């Protein structure tokens, strides 16, 4: 096995940077013991750690849960991987539950339920939604990850989105009544977050799609848990998936 070979090679040198180099080879394949070694050996965030995290994120989008576990280990050690800071072209909008980095030129309105972001002639609606199950434990969150994969990975109009190891979801393209939309569902261990970009111009929608994805991935939670007051708001996102998938996922985070 590759890791044993790498351990052998790393043991043959006293050069710490060489040892890290060896373990990186295996860590970039989402091998958890190698990632654990990296976390033990590298004290602070470095460009190599950022690259490793990015590669693990790409692996996680293909359906490998060891990449999610590895990402979580890195996030706990290097917290800056998760907390996105605004760039010079962005501004921060926030409410009781989360904050977002949005383009400076956009017009944004936000309240505790959600809000809107206007980009040229397109509008992005966003909202927070209640989490229907408890997912504080890693094994419960991995069940949600697998449910999202089973639902969206086979769909050619959908894509898996990994903002971080505890902010996972999907992006879906749709056209209805000459309105083109791109919808994002992100699920954390605390809340659900929904984003919807709508435009009558398909080219404009596609042009802003990546911008909306960037906004969604910039989401940082405050830690507050959202509880829906209206019944209609309880039947969206993961709640809807759980209702339509009778395959044991309803047991996520619930006591026997």
For every predicted segment, state its role.
Residues 111-207, 251, 256:
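Conserved polar/disulfide-associated segments of primarily extracytoplasmic proteins
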Residues 12-22, 45-54:
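Structural signature of tandem alpha-helical TPR/SEL1-like repeats
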Residues 104-108, 193-250, 256:
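Surface-exposed amphipathic alpha-helical segments
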Residues 25-26, 56-59:
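Canonical positions in the second alpha-helix
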Residues 2-5, 9, 19, 38, ...:
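Structural register within alpha-helical repeat arrays
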Residues 5, 41-42, 59, 74-81:
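TPR/TPR-like alpha-solenoid repeats
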Residues 1-2, 6-11, 29-32, 38, ...:
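Short helix-capping/linker turns of helical repeat alpha-solenoids
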């Amino acid at each position: 096995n590759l890791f044993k070979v790498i351990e052998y090679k790393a043991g043959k040198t006293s050069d710490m940077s060489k040892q890290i180099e060896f373990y990186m080879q295996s860590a970039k394949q989402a091998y958890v013991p190698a990632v654990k070694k990296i976390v033990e050996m590298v004290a602070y965030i470095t460009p190599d750690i950022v690259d490793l995290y990015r590669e693990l994120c790409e692996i996680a989008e293909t359906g490998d849960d060891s990449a999610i576990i590895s990402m979580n280990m890195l996030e706990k050690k290097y917290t800056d991987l998760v907390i996105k800071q605004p760039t010079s072209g962005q501004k921060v909008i926030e409410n009781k539950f989360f904050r977002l980095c949005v383009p400076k030129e956009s017009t944004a309105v936000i309240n505790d339920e959600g809000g809107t972001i206007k980009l040229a002639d397109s509008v992005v609606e966003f909202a927070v939604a209640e989490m229907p199950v408890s997912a504080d434990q890693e094994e419960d969150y991995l069940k949600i990850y697998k449910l999202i994969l089973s639902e969206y990975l086979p769909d050619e109009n959908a894509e898996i989105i990994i903002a971080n190891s505890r902010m996972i979801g999907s992006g879906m393209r749709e056209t209805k009544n000459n309105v083109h939309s791109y919808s994002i569902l992100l699920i954390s261990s605390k809340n659900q977050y929904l984003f919807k970009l709508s435009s009558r111009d398909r080219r404009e929608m596609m042009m802003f799609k990546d911008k909306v994805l960037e906004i969604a991935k910039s989401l940082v939670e405050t830690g507050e848990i959202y509880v829906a007051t209206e019944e209609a708001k309880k039947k969206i996102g993961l709640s809807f998936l759980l209702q339509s998938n009778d395959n044991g996922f309803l047991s996520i985070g619930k006591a026997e």
